[in-house]
């Protein structure tokens, strides 16, 4: 793993977030390098903003921080913290960092987009830009070649403007989009659907995990959320749209429910869904943070967790391990962690090593629900 990005006689020290003792993954990729090289000789107006969308750990934000008026747009708390940490480590000026639901600055001169794999998020961002961009604004997307599909280009062409691609360099490609304001359409509402067997209706912003239907892991976990007056404080860790936390709130009306996610869109969806589905929405609070970093130790009786297995576009199991470790810290003595996981992931070994005990409380062909007690 290279800790430094060196281009054009300039070096940036860049780390992923959070920093781990042994790191095998870089904080930037070939698509970042391609964007930097392509824009190196561009003349930029220091007064007009440039927008950087989906900058994983701040490589692009750091590169342009001294050169332009930068606004970075991200749905990820982890990406935001990584960007801030890398700006600080390289003694660079701060940049404006906003989430995907915030209003974008007007009259940008350049938009750089790390193209997301999630087509719903890409569509949302393209439509948001189409309402905003002046005709002279240059828009350049970038991603690995394998992640730029015909469907990706069709979305760009449909929702923002005429789209062309570059040659591939180091297995990365650029996408050039000419803004066309006549394509502007009303911004789409959050996707809504029902979970009829539980009497829950869910609204999902564009980047919420499994935002078009209930994922099969959550469907199993919903049937095994415990009910007991001993639970005063319950955490839904990696809450997504909040369906697990909402079910826990209904089964345990005496409990305070804290839903946690690193996605700003997830937390917003969760808050909206609590208002839609709970008689006392104030019972549930949604917060955006990295796992349970901002939760007081020994403050919870029950943690419910459906861990992700990727960070940004990278598949990794360290997030699940971090979630389990954080859960142990925030649980009170005799507090319980209930986890749903694909049976191939082997969470039982991790939980046994960490808690000293693990029990299978439910399973089907694909998933297992585990319980460990502190």
Swiss-Prot record:
Spans traversing the lipid bilayer: none
SUPFAM superfamilies: S-adenosyl-L-methionine-dependent methyltransferases (SSF53335)
Alphabetical list of Pfam families matching this protein: MTS
Keywords of the record: Cytoplasm, Methyltransferase, rRNA processing, S-adenosyl-L-methionine, Transferase
A GO molecular-function descriptor: nucleic acid binding
Keyword Transport among record annotations: no
Catalysed reactions listed for this entry: guanosine(1835) in 23S rRNA + S-adenosyl-L-methionine = N(2)-methylguanosine(1835) in 23S rRNA + S-adenosyl-L-homocysteine + H(+)
Function per UniProt: Specifically methylates the guanine in position 1835 (m2G1835) of 23S rRNA.
Family to which the UniProt record says this protein belongs: Belongs to the methyltransferase superfamily. RlmG family.
Protein name in UniProt: Ribosomal RNA large subunit methyltransferase G
Organism: Photobacterium profundum (strain SS9)
